[in-house]
Amino acid sequence: MTLLLKNTLYLALIISVISSFPTSLFAQNCGCAPNLCCSNFGFCGTGTPYCGVGNCQSGPCEGGTPTTPTTPTTPTTPGTGGGGSSVSDIVSQAFFDGIIGQAAASCPGKNFYTRAAFLSAVDPKFGNEGSSDDNKREIAAFFAHISHETTNLCHIEERDGDVGDAYCDQDKAAQYPCAAGKKYYGRGPLQLSWNYNYALAGQAIGFDGLGNPEKVATDVNTSFKAAMWFWMTNVHSVMNQGFGATTKAINGALECNGQNQDQANDRIQFYKKYCADFGVAPGDNLTC
């Protein structure tokens, strides 16, 4: 057999072996062909392990909704960050009850808000991307703001919201058109407001925010999910700047730079209390 023939046969054999590899072994950085899905573990392929809901981060995912890519690790409690404590460990039933227990029996939120609904709404990155102290501070900040906004989870809707402003931003109405007869005043734990926030929250968590804004006040799971959406979209990324930055992200136009200091200080006092409950220092830059 000639050397040329041998080389040709070896090349053919190599190509044959490579071609027989499953498609899932290629493109670990997800440079997949258009017809292949990229799994959460960074492999290309087809079928439920690659394209299924919860398994797919890009490509023709089933349901059309890619998930956030994950890295294979030793299984841990969901929501556990670098410090080893999960959100559910930190937000115990006793902690939650300690907040809502301060609300009067006549408060509408008393029989609406639940710890279970909060936990079901928790984003995987919430209280889960920093040190143990960082994670506890974020959770303390979240509950400080919802305690302020709802007066210890007493209120579901903005007081007198149904007779007040419609919160329809006309500058954004072309993109987020306000529905006839609907008002986009504060609802839920973070008092979600304005037509554009309702629209975007609805798109993110799956409800008609413009046509049915009332759902944030009637369905507790939607209520907490809308609050978590707002937090992760607008607040989560500034936690490393201190609590003051979170106030600025939520209501900076009215409570920063010396404005409405009683309101801003109320948030700070809640934050300090919850940090103390979690055994963590509140850190610097508490004001905005």
From Swiss-Prot:
Biased composition range(s): Low complexity: 64-78
Signal sequence, start to end: 1-27
Entry's induction text: By infection with Cercospora beticola.
Keywords carried by this UniProt record: Carbohydrate metabolism, Chitin degradation, Chitin-binding, Disulfide bond, Glycoprotein, Glycosidase, Hydrolase, Hydroxylation, Plant defense, Polysaccharide degradation, Pyrrolidone carboxylic acid, Repeat, Secreted, Signal
Pyrrolidone carboxylic acid modified-residue sites: 28
Domain Chitin-binding type-1: 28-63
Active site: 149 (proton donor)
Protein EC: 3.2.1.14
Region annotation Catalytic: where it falls in the sequence: 86-288
PTM summary: O-glycosylated on hydroxyprolines; contains xylose.
A UniProt-annotated Pfam family: Chitin_bind_1
GO biological process annotation, one example: defense response
UniProt region (4 X 3 AA tandem repeats of T-T-P), positions on chain: 67-78
Cellular component, GO annotation: extracellular region
Tissues with expression: Localized to infected area.
Compartments (UniProt record): Secreted, Extracellular space
Any GO molecular function: chitin binding
Disordered: region residues: 64-84
Catalytic activity of the protein: Random endo-hydrolysis of N-acetyl-beta-D-glucosaminide (1->4)-beta-linkages in chitin and chitodextrins
Sequence repeat copies, ranges: 67-69, 70-72, 73-75, 76-78
Function: Defense against chitin-containing fungal pathogens.
PANTHER family: CHITINASE FAMILY PROTEIN, CHITINASE-RELATED
Family indicated by similarity: Belongs to the glycosyl hydrolase 19 family. Chitinase class I subfamily.
Protein name: Acidic endochitinase SP2
Protein species of origin: Beta vulgaris (Sugar beet)
